[in-house]
Amino acid sequence: MGIAGSHLVAMGLLALTSQLHAQTTESKGTLTLEGAKAAAAAAAAEARKGNEGASIAIVDDGGNLMYLERMQPTFPMGAHISTEKARTAALFQRPSKLLEDAILGGRTSLLAVVPGPLQGGEPITVNGQIVGAIGVSGASSAARDAVIALAGAAALAGKPSAAR
């Protein structure tokens, strides 16, 4: 095989490799610290509407803590619980309430793998992609935890600047 033939083979392999690479990876947004703070601020504003405190945790899509705010008054354990609710919503890519319902419905084995199976964790979606999650604990009820979390998640919906 001559030099021209070798070049053709190399170019073909390069094209095939590029094509395979394009098929096995995709771009996705990443929640920014500014986005995490904006979600927490919206959640805190919702909590203040009800004159209540809450712990608000924001995690990235891998469940890693990005931002935590413990409003007053709320109990100290709320910081841990809110983080676990957020991790559950991020890692399972669904509201933590759905996992709580599954456990209450008899799927008790989920307790071994779900970090925070309580209402109040919501995925954060930007441009149709889950980029993180918010967890809230310590409001006046589990239902209020969820409402506050939804307010935080909704603050970033449709805001591509929250993810890079």
Q: Each PLM stretch: what is its role?
A:
Residues 22-164:
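Flexible, solvent-exposed loop/hinge segments and secondary-structure transition points
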Residues 1-9:
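Bacterial N-terminal signal peptides that target proteins for export
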Residues 10-15:
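Sec-dependent N-terminal signal peptides
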Residues 17-19:
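N-terminal signal peptide c-region/cleavage motif recognized by signal peptidases
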